[in-house]
Amino acid sequence: MSFEQLFADVFGFPQELVKDELGFREVPRWDSLAHMMLIARIEDTYEMQFTGDEIADMKSVGDLRKSLRAHGVTV
């Protein structure tokens, strides 16, 4: 499953609109609970783990991708 598919699946958001500049304010369902659901799905899918600071700093799709790349994940 691609990162875009994963994001779209968690938020019920059109996959083609998943762009780096997309932030939590533009996705109505991106609240704190959904954010943690997304993090759990990402960690399970890519077999890695974010730090608490990384999770707190994720405010956009671009932030998510940057953190994934820092963990060696190609997205």
List each language-model region with its residue ranges.
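Short alpha-helical elements of helix-turn-helix
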Residues: 1, 33-36
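Phosphopantetheine carrier-protein modules
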Residues: 10-29, 46-59
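Short, cationic-aromatic polyanion-contact patches
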Residues: 63-67
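An alpha-helix initiation/capping motif
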Residues: 1, 58-62
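Thiotemplate assembly-line natural product biosynthesis machinery
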Residues: 1-16, 69-75
